[in-house]
A protein has these predicted regions:
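Surface-exposed, charge/polar-rich loops and edge strands
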Residues: 1-339
């Protein structure tokens, strides 16, 4: 596992997104031993050619983080994870001090009521019932009713709240459900997408619900022993057919890769625990725009599978050139290394 470790200085972790969105730096790796190129995301259309299919993840981050209070006045934080039968799975903090049956209320929205149930998973997940005006909030599409009390959950390494709330959402976000953003897509603007279309490329959308597991590092010595988290995904038939017919498929973000490569190995929708790591093949994706990832993460291992150990040179170059890392950081454009 040491080979997937690298030193990430605190100063390199972006605390706020680039403004405007497409002003973020873009490190371009053309492969085949060619030197790296340094550009900005605004230059992305120059890397796209006629006939490309560019695929984005249109998932939307829900207001899943709720600051609530018990009747006694104690503060409790609830992080909604995903709908389950009769309620939601959620992380509750401080979990051990909140008994099953406890009712929680929001000072921001008196119409919101949360009832904490039993523990349902080894990691402390609890079953909870969410009510708004006495009506159940039963699925992700209904979480818009929580917007007054809830907020988008930011990754634990982002402490700044100086950015506008909408900046942790892509401009094309449509399908509610995620508790984390598909961060490579945060760089794209409507204008940039139109420039890509003007190049004769086609833009297609998939939906992969990004779960809390995306932040979990690999803690075992052998990646083969890592238990990969599962997420829901959907690839429309029209998008699938476009990718099948394309000369080159460009994925925006690792979540898009996971959706497409899961579809290639099974069905066009469902749940996936696909772990793309060294030795994995990429059946659909030819090029990838993605952010710089955490050490020892499954996302970094996906990059290693996609381009080989060249990622180490890319990350070293990025740190030397003061690129910003992680969710609000800069990006890189990679071409698949043929094995």
């Amino acid at each position: 596992m040491g080979e997937f470790d690298y030193e990430l200085p605190e100063r390199a972790i972006a605390q706020n997104p680039a403004e405007p969105r497409d002003s973020a730096k873009l490190l371009v790796d053309l492969g085949h031993g060619q030197p790296f190129e340094h550009a900005s995301v605004a230059n992305l259309p120059e890397l796209i050619v006629e006939g490309d299919v560019v695929v984005v993840n249109e998932t939307s981050v829900i207001p899943a983080r709720l600051q609530l209070k018990k009747a006694t006045g104690g503060v409790v934080e609830v992080l909604l994870l995903e709908p389950i039968a009769g309620g939601w799975s959620a992380l509750v903090r401080p979990g051990r001090r909140v008994k099953s049956g406890t009712e929680l209320r929001s000072e921001k929205d008196p119409d919101l009521q949360v009832i904490v149930g039993d523990e349902i998973a080894e990691d402390g997940q609890r079953k909870i019932v969410v009510l708004h005006r006495d009506e159940p909030v039963a699925n992700a599409s209904e979480t818009v009713r929580l917007s007054k009390a809830g907020e988008s959950p930011l990754p634990p390494y982002i402490r700044s709240k100086a950015h506008a709330p909408g900046r942790y959402q892509t401009v094309y976000a449509r399908t509610p459900g995620s508790v984390a953003a598909p961060t490579a897509g945060l760089h794209l603007t409507e204008g940039l997408l139109q420039q890509i279309r003007d190049k004769g490329a086609r833009i297609e959308k998939v939906d992969l619900v990004v779960g809390i597991g995306t932040f979990r590092p690999v803690t075992v010595d052998d990646p083969a022993d890592h238990v990969m988290h599962s997420e829901s995904y959907k690839v429309d038939e029209s998008a699938w057919e476009a990718c099948q017919a394309a000369e080159r498929v460009v994925a925006i973000g690792t979540t898009t890769v996971r959706a497409l490569e899961s579809a290639a190995r099974g069905t066009l929708s469902g749940r996936t625990n696909l772990f793309l790591r060294r030795g994995s093949t990429f059946e659909i994706v030819d090029a990838l725009m993605t952010n710089f990832h955490m050490p020892r993460s499954t996302l970094l291992m996906m990059i290693d599978a996609f381009i080989g150990t060249r990622w180490k040179d890319i990350y070293r170059e990025a740190l030397e050139k003061d690129y910003r890392f992680l969710s609000f950081g800069d990006a890189m454009f990679l071409h698949k290394t043929e094995s």
